Amino acid sequence: MEAAIKENKKIGLRSTAHHAQLNVVKWNVLNSARAGLTSMEHWYGLPEALFNNRIIQNYPPNYNYQNEQHRFEEAGKLWAQAAKPFSDHWNNVMDELISLDFTISPTLNIYEASRDLHLSLIHI
C-alpha cells in the first residue's frame, strides 16, 4: 500500500482505497492516512483505528466472512467496540484524520438496499 501511495503522489494524484476487512487488523485507516492516502471508501478500518483496548475485532466464533449479510451485521457491531464518540481517543483519531486532509466516503445507502433486498427474498 505504501509503495502504491508513494508512486501515486509522485504524479500528483489523490488516492482512495477500500480497506479489506480481513486486513484492517494490520493496516487500518490511520496507517493509510499517515502513508498519504487521501480518502477511503465505505468505512472498513475506521472502527479498528478507534479501538481502545484491542487490536483484533471481537467477532463471534460462528462468524462467516463469506456470508455477506453476516459480514455486514458483524461489521456494524464493531462500532460498539470502538472508542465512544467525543472521547479523548475518538477526538485524537478524528483530529489526526482532519489534519491529514483525509476524506471518508461512507457509502451507506448500498447497505440499506442490500438489507431490503435480502429481507424481501425471505418473505417470498
Question: What feature does the model see in each segment?
Answer:
Residues 1-106, 118-120:
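Histidine/acidic residue-rich metal-binding segments in metalloenzymes
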Residues 113, 117:
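Accessory carbohydrate-binding/adhesion or oligomerization-edge regions at the termini
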Residues 110:
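Acidic/polar, glycine-anchored loop/turn motif associated with catalytic or activation segments
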